[in-house]
């Protein structure tokens, strides 16, 4: 590995030191002003209670450190003409990032009513954490942000996601020492083993040790520096330390650290790109240790504040009520000497702006933080090239995800030059039958390789790490900066990112309301190895509840699809990969599955989202006696098997079969953009006939989606009810009363008049279930009549 030493130590001139400090002081002033001031933004008169916000909200403690980093990033971006993005892990330091955006002018360009003058400063202060204003965190409303930082742990994964396939981009990532204690952040350190120095950009982690969380010390700030260095070097970084509480000394040391780090990054990238990458790089990082709440009140009411946990939020909490707090606040604000930082009209002075880059080089104006501006349509080949031939329903079987894998392989090939599509997953690409993609791209890997390894590739675009958090963080960062991707995961274990998807949906919902944010590619989940075919791994691997979780979220941003076969999966995949600003959840099987629909039929059915399969039922021109509804591949097979049994045993019964692909179709139109009108729903499911619904997941979800429908009282749902174990595939459905025999029994029980007339049929079905129990316990396999079942029209 090439070595680099910074031969000439960075020596800031007096002018550079003065202007850097002026910028930092201005940002600190603006950050504090946002927390406290309702009026008198430039302190042109003595501060009075009337100038103070009635409710003080915000986080001061991290803001001076974020302002310091932003100031020094400005310096190196301008000096080196860098294309840069910053991920602010301590997103509760929103006042700092807003202050810097206003200083550089990107805020006023985004929000012209918040001008870069005294009037605009007053509005900037008033709107912060104020009704009708802006949130306290680095939310989507903040120019330059791709990471809100409200829920901690995801900053570093987002930063790496942004850097992948962005070879000219520097992504700085500020990691708070509180966030550094989270599990997702701990796993994210390993992302450097996946960063390709040839095709990817660089990530510069900046670990900010200000010593405290809300009310406790932080772990990494209280271990000896040699131990911390060992930890960070073990993660694969070369730490550069900056420690101090004297502003001028810290400015000089931080400028030196940035230059050393970026010199090393430039050398590493240049060597890899000119000579080829042959071994893993030890990337630099900065460890910045400064006081929490630096430059704020040293003491309040006789208790230390600066450099303690008491500086975390609002260090002076009673400014309106307490004259001493008001006096301290005015002294604090005037300590920044705002008259030197802003002219009489409130505009930043030349010294303040001396370090600020221009145009799109400004952190608040980078198009990488508004990725939709950079997004190109994904080249998706014609589906007919990959469709399975279906001459008649149920005559052939295919593994749906394997068929999808062929499509994804072609997408990988078609994006090989432009490199804007990635497949991520926690070590499950091959298990989920998507391994055809390895013919187009290997698995990204920069660590040691052995002869036994397969498909590892320093330049690969398939990303596998056994951390669902890191997978999701990578993909979110990749999407937010204008690219495309797919997250493949075992259905049960996607719950690990429940909270992460909450945050992404919130981001999408807010972004949709901002005209200046361009739509980004959707976050697409492929959930497979699902509940009904985890018979071999058992109860721990059986949980279909992610769909329930997602459908609780903002309806304008979430979609859920359960394609029943290979061709419908292709159609759904084509749709979600083209979509924008959604979280799409696709649940599909990887085991051999009957092919029900031709490609043409699949397109039409998926476009409807729900529809009648006339060939599967026995209803003629009249009304049905019963509706058999299904959603999901295994429930669809069981419904069709039940329909066949009814045709044989009760041929006079008029059975309608309805298949649902788009779960949100069940919602009322006023509750979801895809929802059906009552007229449509009643036409499909009737208002007065029994509906036996076989559903892939927890049955209560169907009741919740359809509770307001006219015929809800006639709706009877079968699904997974936590009756799981290691057993045979068919026993899984029997244990949960989703099997064909139970569905026929439900029909007999619920169609008026059948209870007596069809008692013998019901008994036959019950006997079949009894026979099943005895058979599997003796033979360990399903009944031949089940294992060898085929659809016969």
Curated annotation (Swiss-Prot):
- Please tell me which top-level EC class this enzyme sits in: lyase
Q: What InterPro entries has UniProt attached to this entry?
A: Phosphoketolase, THDP-binding, Transketo_C/PFOR_II, Xul5P/Fru6P_PKetolase, Xul5P/Fru6P_PKetolase_C, Xul5P/Fru6P_PKetolase_CS, Xul5P/Fru6P_PKetolase_N, Xul5P/Fru6P_PKetolase_ThDP_BS
Note whether Lyase occurs among the keywords: yes
Q: What is this protein called?
A: Probable phosphoketolase
Lineage, top-rank taxon, reads Bacteria
Q: Which GO terms describe its biological process?
A: carbohydrate metabolic process
Q: Give the UniProt family note.
A: Belongs to the XFP family.
Q: Which PROSITE patterns match?
A: PHOSPHOKETOLASE_1 (PS60002), PHOSPHOKETOLASE_2 (PS60003)
Q: What EC number(s) does its UniProt record assign? A: 4.1.2.-
Q: Which Pfam families match?
A: XFP, XFP_C, XFP_N
Taxonomic lineage of the native organism: Bacteria, Bacillati, Actinomycetota, Actinomycetes, Kitasatosporales
| Keyword Lyase part of the UniProt annotation | yes
Q: Required cofactors, per record?
A: thiamine diphosphate
Q: Gene3D superfamilies per the record?
A: 3.40.50.920, 3.40.50.970
Query: Which NCBIfam families does this chain map to?
Result: PRK05261.1-2 (NF003617), PRK05261.1-4 (NF003619), PRK05261.1-6 (NF003621)
Alphabetical list of PANTHER family matching this protein: PHOSPHOKETOLASE-RELATED
Q: Which UniProt keywords apply?
A: Lyase, Thiamine pyrophosphate
Record GO terms (molecular function): aldehyde-lyase activity; magnesium ion binding
